[in-house]
């Protein structure tokens, strides 16, 4: 969660004692205030939704298992179910169907199939981890020039499907690299000529492809923009509405819980310089996993990430270098006796931090899951060390080499704290073996981590310069490789693009671990894209994040 675009302000005191000079950031206030504190959960309404879902759920299950449905219709149905965020309800049935269809796959069967249908089939397989060959798109290229045929440029639905399919590519799939560029160019040239739902579909894909979006928001937008795709299935339409409204009630209650906790902790009084972003942080964590079973996990991860906001803003927008050195030492000691060594203003935070983790350790130890809490705590200590390194660089005017910057920057991106804290409340999914795999720092984790750092840097480097903060990856890349600012940004974007390919590869079968463990890694990269693609959406949440929070927690779907 990088820092801010506000101009630095100096604080001095006219009294005989001169106060330290502090880089106050004047963060924008919360967009929401106490709005979500007043929510009152109607348990009877949740029970009503849950009961009402049973019949359409059984009907959708029968559709998925229908042996008379041809393969293209079956794959289209599975794709729609996935886009609506309902896959987890029917995962066993869907994988059973895809296992059979994947085994029966024959490239010759696609000779007479149109681009839109092929694209839907391709996405249905790839999203669920089946590596359908990208050769299915070869027939849309010219044999002589190897370029995509201009004749498909008028097939808007086909182009849209091709563009969405290309986002699922892995390294070495040049045809999908070409497909992405070709389809994007053609769609941009056509978008202003389109009308109705198709225009909205294209605009949304160009703004952010489905694969790189927040699952719950993408499901909500799909429901609105693609109703003609699934309205023929009454049961699916009804289930999607009930499901969204059920989840909304559960999630608004979770948001109320963390909002009350935040208010009770009085952080806005004891550390008034910080960003007040409770709904935005909850949204971020919801982006990692929205399924009902992860309710406790979301609450835990949101609280820890809110701790991180206080820490980040203290290092970045308030503390003096000497104060930050003392705070870093105290966090590494992790001992209440260290409280007397740190500035008075940060002592309430320090006590609450240690108390909350102690309670988590007590709770998770009973379940035999203490290691996940320890991993989260150690990540928190790591980021404090990373923050002080950045503060020392800023103080001395030092610009690190790009490799040196990335070594520390991957830590200060906050990825490690958020991702490990997301594991704490996930239950049996996070076994000892799963945690060991996570700690081995596999390629998919490295890729998601890199996106978290560089997407942030590409969007915020100018703001950081204005505030006189430590050099970002853009600055370090320019210094290390002697390139222009434009060239540096282009190179970092290429690194981000390649990292997405590694994430896509890591989600394909056979997988090293279950998709339950991989999904938060994939989804954290998605949330970084949501927050930082167009602006610093966390510091200035009045655009994208406000729209998302309204979609998910304010507006319901009419039944």
UniProtKB/Swiss-Prot annotation:
Ligand binding (Mg(2+) 2): 312, 316
Localization (cell): Cytoplasm
Reaction(s) this enzyme catalyzes, per UniProt: (2E,6E)-farnesyl diphosphate = (+)-(R)-germacrene A + diphosphate
Domain of life: Eukaryota
Major enzyme class: lyase
Any one of the GO CC terms: cytoplasm
Cofactor: Mg(2+)
Keywords: Cytoplasm, Lyase, Magnesium, Metal-binding
EC code(s) of this entry: 4.2.3.23
Pfam families per record: Terpene_synth (PF01397), Terpene_synth_C (PF03936)
Annotated cofactor note: Binds 3 Mg(2+) ions per subunit.
Record: residues binding Mg(2+) 1: 312, 316
Residues annotated for (2E,6E)-farnesyl diphosphate binding in this entry: 275, 312, 316, 453, 456
Molecular functions per Gene Ontology: germacrene-A synthase activity; magnesium ion binding
Pathway annotation from the record: Secondary metabolite biosynthesis; terpenoid biosynthesis
Record carries keyword RNA-binding: no
Motif (DDXXD motif): 312-316
Tissues expressed in: Highly expressed in glandular trichomes. Expressed in roots and leaves.
Keyword Coiled coil: no
Protein family membership: Belongs to the terpene synthase family. Tpsa subfamily.
Role: Sesquiterpene synthase involved in the biosynthesis of volatile compounds. Mediates the conversion of (2E,6E)-farnesyl diphosphate (FPP) into (+)-(R)-germacrene A.
Domains: entry comment: The Asp-Asp-Xaa-Xaa-Asp/Glu (DDXXD/E) motif is important for the catalytic activity, presumably through binding to Mg(2+).
Quaternary structure and partners: Monomer.
The protein, known as: Sesquiterpene synthase TPS3
Natural source organism: Xanthium strumarium
